[in-house]
Curated annotation (Swiss-Prot):
Its EC number is 3.1.3.16. Binds 2 magnesium or manganese ions per subunit. It holds the Pfam family PP2C. This is Probable protein phosphatase 2C 39. Its cofactor is Mg(2+); Mn(2+). Belongs to the PP2C family. Mn(2+) 1 binds at D195, G196. GO terms for biological process: signal transduction. It catalyses: O-phospho-L-seryl-[protein] + H2O = L-seryl-[protein] + phosphate; O-phospho-L-threonyl-[protein] + H2O = L-threonyl-[protein] + phosphate.
Length: 520
């Protein structure tokens, strides 16, 4: 259900003292992840923090913020800070994820080109490392891989998610992981926030597999659309690998009847859902194979938030309590901003989720204990956390770690919430955040903070700014100075705030953004 909040655009004053500003500048070094991406009329460029300082005392000297009228976004920024102490996970999948794949993918401070092979994906490597197919339920997945390989290298160059010019940024903060992938030529953006718990193994697994899963299933959708709409052999359907047939299909959908457009968008959402289901099957299969050595893996899980943006189409999937919040100005001309929550809250704090859980287990008085599912977990839908889904995985745990009276699993579900939104001229930006952000700010407060900041700092970094404001508020609530809070080591700091991961996407073109920024 879409949640909307209205408030006055000019209601808050966000000035800070010079002491606080000095602390915030120093806090940049404590960010685990901080990246930015700006688009212009011809290309997008990465903001490498080694080259650019976007601190309160220094601004980028550039006039290349103008984007094409067809651009899906003007710029984005991402930032993350840890509070949980988490060891780097190097041993799942025989160490392949931690030792080989993640070092290749992680780029916490800038976007960089993805090095990929048309003949062997990261998922192939994982299958090889385990000596068998990653999942026992991979028939569709195997078909997609066969189609992929039979068409290489043409397929790889034609699919937007594997074109040679895509760039990725991301990294880890405590148990969280964040990724952002952009295809400059095809105008696609995909972002993921994976809020892990009981360890980071599940979030790490998502970071190295979910993107590839999305690639495969969108490619299958691409093939089906080409067949159904006669794009094979047409001039538009053969661009020598410059643009994606899926991009062409999207444009075709925009120019055709509403029924076709809705069917196409439903297909994209289905691809995202199937990609998560595939990752879930693969992860639990891996857990079952390795739980003799790592029984703790059965309790590891992650929330999932994925956003795919192309043109005016915004597709969102979520499991758990991370949020995507859209900021827009009503076309009526009212001097109000509107915060629209595009995601659902899958936790016991949501009455609908609470009642569904009880209804699914009507004869169990101990389903919820201490405001947690079986006394263990607050989120009702999540990736992984196999011991609350399968009895055999729960049996791998010893003593007090094992869930007693696991009568009718699953108790945690994997069916995600999905939604597609047609971006309009009223929509300004989208804020993606793990629940750590919303522990301190409501949806309307988040939108107001970003709006005011972008008005005062049109080429600043709103994701960093949100984390800075969160740290100030956390310190104030704990009766500490901001500097004292920053001195508390990771692990102990979890008493004051959670791991926090944020992505802010400024939608549309610079003309719209500048108009919104000067409307106060």
């Amino acid at each position: 259900m879409v949640d909307e909040e209205l408030f006055d655009k000019s209601s808050n004053d966000h000035s800070i003292s010079s002491e606080e500003e000095d602390m915030l500048v120093r806090s940049y070094s404590n960010l685990n992840v901080s990246f930015g991406y700006h688009c212009n009329s011809y290309q997008c460029f990465s903001l490498d923090t080694d080259e650019y300082d976007i601190s309160p005392n220094k601004r980028l000297e550039t006039n290349t913020m103008m984007t094409s009228q067809n651009g899906s976004f003007t710029c984005l920024s991402g930032a993350a800070i840890s509070a949980n102490f988490t060891l780097a996970n190097t041993n799942i999948c025989k160490g392949l994820i931690g030792e080989e794949i993640l070092p290749e993918l992680d780029s916490p401070n800038s976007f960089r080109k993805i090095v990929s092979s048309p003949s062997m994906s990261r998922l192939d490597l994982l299958s090889t490392s385990q000596g068998s197919p990653v999942s026992t339920e991979s028939s569709i997945f195997e078909i997609s891989k066969n189609i992929w390989r039979s068409s290489a290298p043409t397929t790889v160059s034609s699919n937007f998610l594997t074109s040679t010019e895509i760039k990725m940024a991301g990294g880890a903060a405590g148990e969280d992981r964040v990724q952002a992938v952009c295809s400059e030529k095809n105008g696609w953006l995909i972002c993921g926030i994976y809020d892990g718990f009981n360890g980071r193994d599940a979030a790490d697994f998502l970071a190295v597999t979910l993107y590839d899963n999305i690639v495969y299933y969108l490619y299958l959708l691409e093939c089906r659309i080409k067949q159904e709409n006669g794009l094979y052999g047409s001039p538009e359907g053969s661009l020598n690998g410059v643009k994606s047939e899926l991009t062409l299909a999207m444009r075709f959908a925009e120019n055709e009847d509403v029924k076709f457009s809705e069917t196409f968008r439903a297909g994209v959402l289905k691809c995202l859902t199937t990609a998560v289901e595939q990752a879930e099957n693969d992860f639990l299969c891996m857990v079952e194979q390795e739980m003799d050595d790592r029984p703790d893996l059965v309790s590891v899980g992650s929330c999932v938030l994925v956003v795919l943006l192309h043109g005016t189409d915004l597709c969102i999937l979520n499991l758990g309590d991370s949020r995507a919040v859209l900021a827009s100005v009503p076309s009526s001309g009212m001097d109000k901003l509107k915060a629209v929550q595009l995601t659902e809250i899958h936790s016991l704090e949501n009455p609908l989720e609470y009642q569904k859980l009880l209804a699914d287990h009507p004869n169990e008085p101990s389903v919820v204990m201490g405001n947690k599912i079986k006394g263990k977990l607050k989120v009702t839908r999540a990736f992984g956390v196999g011991y609350l889904k399968q009895k055999k995985l729960n049996d791998a745990l010893m003593g007090i770690l094992r869930v007693r009276n696991l009568c009718s699993p699953p108790y945690v579900y994997t069916n995600p919430h999905t939604v597609s939104h047609k971006v309009t001229e009223d929509d300004l930006f989208v804020v993606l955040g793990s629940d750590g952000l919303f522990d301190f700010f409501s949806n309307d407060e988040v939108v107001q903070l970003v709006y005011q900041f972008m008005h005062d700092n049109p080429i600043g970094d709103p994701a960093k700014y949100l984390i800075e404001q969160l740290l100030l508020k956390a310190a104030k609530e704990a009766a500490l100075t901001a500097e004292e809070l920053m001195r508390i080591p990771v692990g102990s700091r979890r008493k004051y705030h959670d791991d926090v991961t944020i992505i802010v996407i400024i939608l549309g073109n610079a003309q719209r953004t500048m108009t919104a920024s000067t409307s106060l």
